[in-house]
């Protein structure tokens, strides 16, 4: 069984009782900022590399590993712009701040310059009728400037609010898993990893961009890779097995795919008037891939700007977050930004300090961890709307945390705990945990209330060899005042037909592996 830690859970409840005006005070509203486009507008290709960190480079190049698993991307950043200053041999990248450490949060940070603080589950924004109607994002700005915009990915785009956000803020066209099936790009019923693999995504992107460029209209083509998603990624059949571990080979192959795609772009007639931005969407959430790195190493996402319309004014190493990608992307297109700030982001090509440089990383993180009434007002979320309640009741959201509490190797039992239960009112009168094994067999166990710390514990029998399974699905059923109010398949809904249990103790993970 595979396990991983949840990010930002431990401090969430505590911080929701403390408010901060940091975002309100520092936010620069793009709708009230003068933006001047060049006479000839540049095209944009934005590549979100799933879970891609600069950490995957070797230590000699500013990474955290003994061997460089992204050598081509390392060279690409060093040859272009990653805001590392005069020392091009050391990679630089953006910090992922609180409420930006998953895909939709990462995209929102890079295009709106804000953390995705919401009053609903992090991946349930698709249940809302609107997505932060009070903001102006990158897509809005480019749409108003006459850009044709497409977002492509190898999974269903609707998950996590991506479709809602990009439709509302930019009127994007979507080329996703459903589009690929409907248009014969993949066969009906074809399903690999999260939908279809990156090899097919990049081939689709080449055709899409060729067609968009032929219209003469400036374009923004944004794509999100998926092969490198945790847990352990998807290794294409054509990939080289250079390293001893699977995930390193996945990143090494993605490194090859992305840079080959960039090389293809450079041969196209539209390239001279096109800027390419490559960024990790967030640090990897894989359970064990980064466990042996130096604990003092500060992980950052991979960042690279290629063929920018402008050069840096202050050629020193910058300290920045993914918020700064918002104005920096526009600046790379040759857009002049009055004040060089948008959202919480700063134009890194300018000499203006980022908020991280101004306040320090810890101070900024601390403020962003607190509840912001300003963000609640901007979000436009309604946790009482009928669609959201129906989603809670029938489909499930990450409305609680389920994790492995303990494992008894002699009794062949595991204790699963349900904690941090989200509900809108009433009293909890029943909690159970249902485990579905890959063979379809199920166990449903009533959880007992541990009053000392508020969690609910359920002891499940795994003597049938369940620990040998690669993954098992876990549902927590929570009844509020005798009505079935919540059902949560703890891990993200789009994790295919399986989910995995997060574990907060690597020792337990090792125990299970050794017992299987």
Language model segments and positions:
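Aromatic sugar-binding surface patches on proteins
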Residues: 450-463
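Surface-exposed, short loops/turns at beta-strand junctions within beta-sandwich domains
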Residues: 461-473
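Active-site-proximal alpha/beta segments of enzymes that process anionic O-linked groups
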Residues: 1-42, 46, 53-219, 226-241, ...
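Metal-dependent active-site segment of extracytoplasmic phospho-/sulfohydrolases and closely related
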Residues: 253-292, 330, 336
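Membrane-interface soluble catalytic domains
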Residues: 140, 157-166, 309-434, 468, ...
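Solvent-exposed serine/threonine-rich low-complexity stretches and specific carbohydrate-binding patches
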Residues: 441-453
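Extracellular recognition modules
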Residues: 473-479
């Amino acid at each position: 069984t595979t396990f991983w830690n949840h990010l930002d859970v431990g401090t969430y409840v505590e911080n929701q009782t403390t408010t901060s005006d940091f975002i309100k005070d520092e936010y620069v509203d793009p709708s009230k900022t003068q933006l001047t486009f060049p006479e000839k507008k540049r095209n944009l290709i934005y590549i979100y590399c799933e879970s891609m960190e600069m950490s995957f480079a070797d230590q000699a190049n500013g990474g955290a590993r003994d061997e460089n698993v992204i050598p081509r991307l390392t060279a690409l950043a060093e040859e272009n712009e990653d805001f590392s200053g005069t020392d091009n041999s050391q990679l630089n990248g953006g910090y992922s701040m609180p409420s930006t450490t998953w895909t939709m949060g990462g995209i929102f940070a890079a295009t709106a310059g804000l953390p995705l603080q919401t009053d609903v589950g992090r991946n349930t924004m698709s249940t809302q009728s609107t997505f932060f109607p009070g903001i102006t994002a990158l897509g809005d700005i480019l749409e108003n400037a006459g850009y044709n915009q497409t977002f492509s990915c190898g999974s269903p785009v609707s998950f996590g609010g991506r479709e809602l956000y990009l439709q509302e803020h930019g009127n994007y066209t979507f080329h996703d898993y459903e589009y690929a099936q409907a248009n014969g790009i993949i066969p009906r019923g074809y399903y690999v990893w999260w939908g279809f693999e990156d090899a097919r995504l990049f081939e689709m992107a080449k055709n899409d961009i060729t067609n968009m460029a032929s219209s003469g209209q400036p374009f923004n083509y944004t794509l999100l890779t998926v092969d490198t998603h945790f847990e352990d990624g998807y290794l294409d059949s054509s990939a080289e097995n250079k390293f001893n571990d699977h995930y390193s080979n996945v990143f090494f192959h993605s490194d090859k795919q992305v840079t080959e795609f960039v090389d293809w772009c450079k041969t196209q007639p539209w390239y001279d008037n096109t800027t390419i931005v490559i960024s990790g969407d967030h640090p990897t959430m894989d359970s064990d891939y980064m466990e042996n790195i130096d604990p003092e190493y500060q992980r950052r996402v991979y960042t690279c700007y290629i063929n920018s319309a402008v050069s840096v004014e202050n050629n020193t190493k910058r300290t920045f977050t993914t918020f700064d990608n918002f104005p920096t992307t526009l600046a790379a297109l040759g857009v002049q930004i009055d004040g060089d700030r948008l959202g919480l982001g700063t134009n890194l090509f300018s000499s203006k300090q980022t908020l991280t440089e101004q306040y320090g990383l810890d101070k900024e993180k601390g403020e962003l961890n607190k509840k912001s009434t300003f963000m609640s007002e901007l979000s436009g979320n309604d946790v009482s709307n009928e669609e959201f309640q129906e989603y809670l009741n029938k489909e499930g959201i990450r409305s609680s945390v389920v994790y492995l509490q303990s494992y008894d190797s002699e009794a062949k039992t595991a204790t699963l705990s349900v904690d941090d239960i989200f509900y809108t009112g009433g009293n909890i009168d029943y909690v159970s945990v249902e485990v579905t094994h890959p063979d379809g067999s199920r166990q449903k166990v009533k959880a007992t209330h541990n009053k000392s710390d508020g969690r609910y514990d359920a002891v499940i029998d795994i003597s049938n060899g369940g620990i040998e399974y690669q993954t098992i699905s876990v549902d927590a059923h929570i009844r509020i005042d005798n009505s079935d109010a919540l059902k949560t398949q703890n891990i993200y809904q789009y994790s295919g037909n399986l989910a995995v249990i997060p574990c907060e103790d690597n020792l337990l993970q090792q125990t299970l592996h050794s017992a299987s």
